[in-house]
Amino acid sequence: MTKKKAHKPGSATIALNKRARHEYFIEEEFEAGLALQGWEVKSLRAGKANIGDSYVILKDGEAYLFGANFQPLNVASTHVVCDPTRTRKLLLNQRELDNLYGRINRDGYTVVALSLYWKNAWCKVKIGVAKGKKQHDKRSDLKEREWQLDKARIMKNAGR
């Protein structure tokens, strides 16, 4: 008999969109389900997903994830046509959809995918209402991050 693998608490994340946090101010985050096909679930379990260029479009009262790339596995069904970049419907409550509509109608706001993760047996995507950063904002964030690292390094060495 084989032993079940121990579930690590930090291993539920499938994919992160680090570029979104660099290029946007994230104002509010939502959790949404994804309407997936069978081969997509298999590729997600194998960790073959990329949401680096993905964004959310609200159309006809529904939300869709564009630009997410789920690479199909070689062992996936041969009778199913696998489109890695197809648009996927996001599963949100009507109240959440109305909230998103109201927020992105303002100038300069958009909705981006932040992370893709497992919650129990369900695949969820964390989306955020975002406003684009200017170049000087990105530079100041970089300086702040470097200062935090230097500060931590100084505090670590001060205790010796």
From Swiss-Prot:
Gene Ontology cellular-component terms listed: cytosol
Give the keywords, sorted: Cytoplasm, RNA-binding
From the UniProt record, give one GO term of the biological process aspect: trans-translation
For this protein, the record's Gene3D superfamilies field holds: 2.40.280.10
Sample GO molecular function, one term? RNA binding
Q: Which InterPro entries match?
A: SmpB (IPR023620), SsrA-bd_prot (IPR000037), SsrA-bd_prot_CS (IPR020081)
Where is it predominantly found?
cytoplasm
One Pfam entry name:
SmpB
Q: Where in the cell is it found?
A: Cytoplasm
Functionally, this protein is described as follows:
Required for rescue of stalled ribosomes mediated by trans-translation. Binds to transfer-messenger RNA (tmRNA), required for stable association of tmRNA with ribosomes. tmRNA and SmpB together mimic tRNA shape, replacing the anticodon stem-loop with SmpB. tmRNA is encoded by the ssrA gene; the 2 termini fold to resemble tRNA(Ala) and it encodes a 'tag peptide', a short internal open reading frame. During trans-translation Ala-aminoacylated tmRNA acts like a tRNA, entering the A-site of stalled ribosomes, displacing the stalled mRNA.
* Family, per entry: Belongs to the SmpB family.
Its protein name is: SsrA-binding protein
Q: Mind giving the lineage of the organism this protein is from? A: Bacteria, Pseudomonadati, Pseudomonadota, Gammaproteobacteria, Enterobacterales
